[in-house]
Amino acid sequence: MSDSKYQIALIGGSGRMGRAIITVLSSSSKSTLSSSVVSGGSVFLGMDSGLHSGIKQNGVNFSSDLEAAVRSADCVIDFSTYQNLDFTLKACIQHRKPVVIGTTGLTELQKDALKVASKEIGIVYSPNMSIGVNLLFKLTEIAAKAMGENSDIEIQDIHHRHKKDAPSGTAEKLKSILLETLGRTSKNVIHGRHGILKERDPREIGIHTFRAGEVIGDHTVYFFTPEERIEITHRAQDRKTFAVGSIHAAEFLVGRKPGLYDMFAVLGL
């Protein structure tokens, strides 16, 4: 590994996203994998992270030593679980290392903890690191400003059958964009529908969640008017799209002042 490359510590390296990040880093010209952290009870402890990810051996074995991983890194990427967030933030603050948080399902208290931590370190937090999805966010905002007040709006979230949180973090972000842009509140949001329904409230925003098959991630925002329908859709074809965005975010953070950044800042949107 070249010392001129950014050293990236990966937390949660044995999962789907971790494997994708390891694969993309293996061919990166700017960054390299310095360590990959898994839980102390993981069956993957000591295994070569490259071989586990389906590429050639990279000499970076899975470890449970979070402190050492963070200490030796230029930036940390965390795709573990929301239960690990406090440990990640504590280690990053202690060693003054910036961190990309890709973990979804964070509680409101944890989101508040990110704001507090960002006073001391740089943090990129986004429910979706894909460049395309962040364009979806921007296009949704534009459409909401242009026609949202005169539209029935629905969000569709489709993911693989193994995904644990619902709605997805991306769907929640789309909801937040719509609520903020249109001046509405969570009282205007409805999750699915069943039974005998009253006439649709014109300010209502519906969210519909599918968990089936092996779908990586599809999201659509619908704007229905009496005359036309706009559908803004993003479909992930490969998890590498999230990995590329995450690594780009890590490279963005290195040397940057403390603060809480999103992917709009990373992409200059």
Swiss-Prot record:
The record's listing under Gene3D superfamilies reads: Dihydrodipicolinate Reductase, domain 2 (3.30.360.10), NAD(P)-binding Rossmann-like Domain (3.40.50.720)
Which enzyme type, at the first EC level?
Answer: oxidoreductase
Its subcellular locations are: Cytoplasm
| Active site residues per record | 159, 163
Q: Where does NAD(+) bind?
A: 12-17, 102-104, 126-129
**Catalytic activity reported:** (S)-2,3,4,5-tetrahydrodipicolinate + NAD(+) + H2O = (2S,4S)-4-hydroxy-2,3,4,5-tetrahydrodipicolinate + NADH + H(+); (S)-2,3,4,5-tetrahydrodipicolinate + NADP(+) + H2O = (2S,4S)-4-hydroxy-2,3,4,5-tetrahydrodipicolinate + NADPH + H(+)
EC number(s) per entry = 1.17.1.8
Q: Which GO terms describe its molecular function?
A: 4-hydroxy-tetrahydrodipicolinate reductase; NAD binding; NADP binding; oxidoreductase activity, acting on CH or CH2 groups, NAD or NADP as acceptor
Binding-site positions, (S)-2,3,4,5-tetrahydrodipicolinate = 160, 169-170
Any Gene Ontology CC annotation: cytosol
In which pathway is this protein known to take part?
Amino-acid biosynthesis; L-lysine biosynthesis via DAP pathway; (S)-tetrahydrodipicolinate from L-aspartate: step 4/4
Principal place of residence: cytoplasm
Query: Which UniProt keywords are given for this protein, alphabetically ordered?
Result: Amino-acid biosynthesis, Cytoplasm, Diaminopimelate biosynthesis, Lysine biosynthesis, NAD, NADP, Oxidoreductase
> Which InterPro entries does the record cross-reference, listed alphabetically?
DapB_C, DapB_N, DapB_N_CS, DHDPR_bac, NAD(P)-bd_dom_sf
Q: What's a BP term from Gene Ontology annotated to this protein?
A: diaminopimelate biosynthetic process
Q: Does the keyword Oxidoreductase apply?
A: yes
SUPFAM superfamilies documented for this protein: Glyceraldehyde-3-phosphate dehydrogenase-like, C-terminal domain (SSF55347), NAD(P)-binding Rossmann-fold domains (SSF51735)
Give the record's family classification.
Belongs to the DapB family.
Write out the function statement from the record: Catalyzes the conversion of 4-hydroxy-tetrahydrodipicolinate (HTPA) to tetrahydrodipicolinate.
Q: Under what name is this protein listed?
A: 4-hydroxy-tetrahydrodipicolinate reductase
Give the originating organism: Leptospira borgpetersenii serovar Hardjo-bovis (strain JB197)
Gene name of this polypeptide: dapB
